[in-house]
């Protein structure tokens, strides 16, 4: 079986969804920009030699509809002979895109693929056109489709207080801002055209979603966003709404070395698991455990974790049940997470994997794990190994 390696990984800055940097930039353009950039950064690989493009996107309608993967590839002037497919596993879409490409390479059906994902939540809101079947309420709680209420449920089940959530949210912004100031994101962010507050076209090379002024005291003044009577989850402890894209160049190790391209990491194992939709945010726990089992590793072997921060109330129970509460500041989301950077649904899997690879290199660790919860009760995880 072929070894699957990540040769390169990049992302756009994360733009605010409401009147942000990418308010006049379409999702296809964000995607095409990264496709072009990956190919330009790795000229040893001819675009025509790509076997496929796998691109995650959740709200596949309006500008994100009709197979955005192919539309973006055409905009990027990728040769017409290269196919492209859009992948949807809700929040896990671009990580699923990575898994799909990895399996193709493992079986010898592909040698080189572009993978990634995008979501423009400003142009195509998360709730646009959603129409759940009324019969679902016979099988799952009605609130299972309301992500904020599932986070409230997890907080109550695991004893996660409002103060714990606010502290974690403040940490996310502080870590992300520190990473920005130190240049830690420089190796992953590709400057991307957008418009500033005055409408002037400029190149953005930073995440505008981060709020460096965030404090626990300020967060404590916010009202519950989903359960106004007894809730603890606020907008401040939830992932921000943002627009962005992320992309990776994935190859067989033999082809990468043949072309003189240096692999950054191997895909050591992959896992996807279902869970009760009412606690959809718990999915990273069984998914991570399965991925670790497949890799022949334990949580203690992992040097760095990237866990998508859908809600502080959601990620903290996952950290607790993976036995990592005492190692948060040493191993988990060291550059902040989605509470500060946002969670553009179809982009986030590739985004956290990209950030993870850079952290693994900076910290000089052998193994890293990226994982995320998925709406309606799933979890997805990937174990990476430095080459």
UniProtKB/Swiss-Prot annotation:
Task: Cite the EC number.
Answer: 2.3.1.16
Q: Which GO terms describe its molecular function?
A: acetyl-CoA C-acyltransferase activity
Protein name (record): 3-ketoacyl-CoA thiolase
Q: Where are the transmembrane segments?
A: none
Q: In which pathway does it act?
A: Lipid metabolism; fatty acid beta-oxidation
Which key words are in the record? Acyltransferase, Cytoplasm, Fatty acid metabolism, Lipid degradation, Lipid metabolism, Transferase
Q: Which domain of life is it from?
A: Bacteria
Q: Which Gene3D superfamilies match?
A: 3.40.47.10
The protein's matches in CDD domains, at most eight in alphabetical order, are given as:
thiolase
| Subcellular location, record wording | Cytoplasm
Tell me, what is an example of a GO biological process annotation in this record? phenylacetate catabolic process
The catalysed reaction is: an acyl-CoA + acetyl-CoA = a 3-oxoacyl-CoA + CoA
Give any Gene Ontology cellular component: cytoplasm
Q: Which organism is it from?
A: Escherichia fergusonii (strain ATCC 35469 / DSM 13698 / CCUG 18766 / IAM 14443 / JCM 21226 / LMG 7866 / NBRC 102419 / NCTC 12128 / CDC 0568-73)
The entry's family comment says: Belongs to the thiolase-like superfamily. Thiolase family.
Which residues are named in the active-site annotation?
91, 343, 373
What is the documented function of this protein?
Catalyzes the final step of fatty acid oxidation in which acetyl-CoA is released and the CoA ester of a fatty acid two carbons shorter is formed.
